[in-house]
């Protein structure tokens, strides 16, 4: 096989969404698996809707996911002369023609078709204009579109690696436009010219583009160019099998990033939207998918987006991430919540991250779980107050805990646990009667990391202060 060359061609008219990210990833994995090239092309011929901000977001999203490109970004808006050159070639060879029909004429054709129960199609009115007629229209200042002469009989077959052969009757196509009256190419025409000039061997894209493919094949054939191989991946649907949209929660890469998902978890999850490794494992790193990825293993069936599964995968990565890397990516979330400023103790944060990460699913969760290390506990979980602070002996137990902790030296998780175990025996109570109200007193919460980990990280002074504050709270509550 000649060198594999694939492309991802986003339009900079919005965010990089999960479907687009998956298309980019599948192209990238296919290129890396085959030792080929991944090209980034920007379909920005819609100048009114394309924005620099969108393009910047798409590039940042790809980089964040670890999807690097070998060539590009190549902007269609900078290649307009190339499209005009190929359109002129088709005009010269009689495979395309100028069409001067007005909006009113086209509307009349649509109405007539509707009246006759036919699908609305261009009638080919300008297909056989004479050279003199064309020159006269141009002299009058009329601005034509250019239409492709589509064969009116036969079939166009899409040989799709994922879906098999898909046939289209040529009679269902009219002579579609390849160049607009403002001299801009249509999507299908620009795509064909680009794919040819960039040497694209495989076009891997979403199923929604399948209807464009026969038109692109007709353009390839008219230009006498080699047709690339096609692979159309299934749609990503919402859990109710409707089209995925904002009402189903986060759908853009930036939103996932802001909500504290790790790029490795996103890549792992979106790889599973249509592909699975040979061993059926659901947690795998990108080196494994690069090694195993083939289009033959991509499913034809729609992929169902499941945010709970994504969050579960993200939790796995948080628990197993390199601790320094995890600390670095948590820090911006701590800053955003004003838990820390620019001057912070990295080693202290790292220690806290190491104890809180076991239970958390996102970086936002990790940051929230760290709150009581940086801010005072101003309120206690209501269910904890009812369950632990209303017990008759709790004040006496906590007072004895303060006396005990004041004597502990050095103050760490081992010495505090030893002291607490002895106190439990001395008071002849269950460990829960001491441990649970202490946890609530020093963290404001009923669940979290190990109690003695929390004590060590808070330090002796803050631990005792918080227990004393809780005693005061309980006594006031009882008055």
From Swiss-Prot:
Location of the motif 'KMSKS' region: 243-247
Annotated keywords: Aminoacyl-tRNA synthetase, ATP-binding, Cytoplasm, Ligase, Nucleotide-binding, Protein biosynthesis
Motif 'HIGH' region boundaries: 10-20
Disulfide bonds: none
Localization annotation: Cytoplasm
Its biological purpose: Catalyzes the attachment of glutamate to tRNA(Glu) in a two-step reaction: glutamate is first activated by ATP to form Glu-AMP and then transferred to the acceptor end of tRNA(Glu).
Complexes and interactors: Monomer.
PANTHER family in the record: GLUTAMATE--TRNA LIGASE, GLUTAMATE--TRNA LIGASE, MITOCHONDRIAL-RELATED
Designated name of the protein: Glutamate--tRNA ligase 2
Organism phylogeny: Bacteria, Bacillati, Bacillota, Clostridia, Thermoanaerobacterales
Name of the gene encoding the protein in the UniProt record: gltX2
